[in-house]
Amino acid sequence: HSVRSMVSTLRHLMDDVVRQEEEKRRSELDVLQSQINPHFLYNTLDSVVWMTENGRTDEATVMLTALARFFRISLSRGSNIIPIADELEHARHYLTIQKMRYKNKFSATITAEDGVESPCTIKLIVQPILENAIYHGMAYADGDGEITILARRDGDDVIIDVTDNGPGMPEEVVERLLDPDAPRANTGSKGSG
């Protein structure tokens, strides 16, 4: 009888741990998704107004369509896990908007190897990386900026590479960011440079 009691207690404890881990993951994902910058929405809508006022209705339509599709995937009915194809489509809409806002200072290429679009990923995992690439590199480009996204297989894993030809970061900054023991200063800013 005591063995059954112990097994039952262990099952309850394991269930509690699994539930707590799921709640933790859900909270972390909510924080990530809340980082969709509201300024992005405001600035995009301001751009649409400006385009419309200046008779550039075709461009305004392209931007609004991309924005609607961007948010359709962002909100995707509460699902936090989406196919890689949807994540890449989300990135495509984000880049369409940003290329228009930044007056085509950069080009973007999105490529997926065969068979990598159907596995699932955490939603909105690429967009913050693109945001960093644009704000810290492409904003200063002179029409020669390039951002490349490649979804590829590496054994059983799917890797999504995001590269750009921006100025990058000094090697010592990269090493410090990757060092788990490095002291962290709270700068109040989001993202890496």
Q: Across the structure, where does each feature detected by a protein language model lie?
A:
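Two-component histidine phosphotransfer core
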Residues: 1-36, 40-192
